Amino acid sequence: SLHDALPISHKINRGEKVSLDNKSMDFFFLKRYEADKIINVTLQLIKQKLPKFVGASEYDIQVLTPMRKGLLGVERLNTILQMYLNPPSDRKKEKEHGAIVFREGDKVMQIKNNYQLEWEIRSKYGLCIDKGTGVFNGDTGIIEEINDFAETITVNFDEGRMVEYSYKLLDELELAYAVTIHKSQGSEYPAVVIPLLSGP
């Protein structure tokens, strides 16, 4: 329901003060003053509370932040969220690329348009039932397979589009447990968590 969220978002857009009394079913505010406490409550919301409340998986709940760097920036949050939601396992292959470790089961995002990248949709038996080209900035998916022999990472994007990335194309992917508010524009999620820390 967007009963409370829409009027609140309109007030925010107009620069008006918003009541944070937590009487809304769609919008609530949890006050914490230190980055570590904010991260802990964010993890609890994603893993335990929100999936039950909104009926969505932890992968569908999106963390949004205004910054890339800093204590609550995308880069740090993605590392923490990856460890919490998709920790290392002997059963999951990994590929290190720069400062990022991609792992089977990771939530990832395409970060620039690639009109030549091929995709296909497969039946439950693995047969190709549709194919095309083009993966676009902001598309999100889950890493299905990392194949060191073929040097590829296969990502299952929304609508079941399977895309095989050669290791040479990994600059086009980043972890997507947390994304910037700017990057999320135009996307829809069943729930979002926005961890914020007041500046000096």
Task: Annotate the PLM regions.
Residues 1, 5-133:
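Conserved helicase motor core of P-loop NTPases
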Residues 79-83, 87-200:
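Conserved nucleotide-binding/hydrolysis modules and their immediate coupling elements
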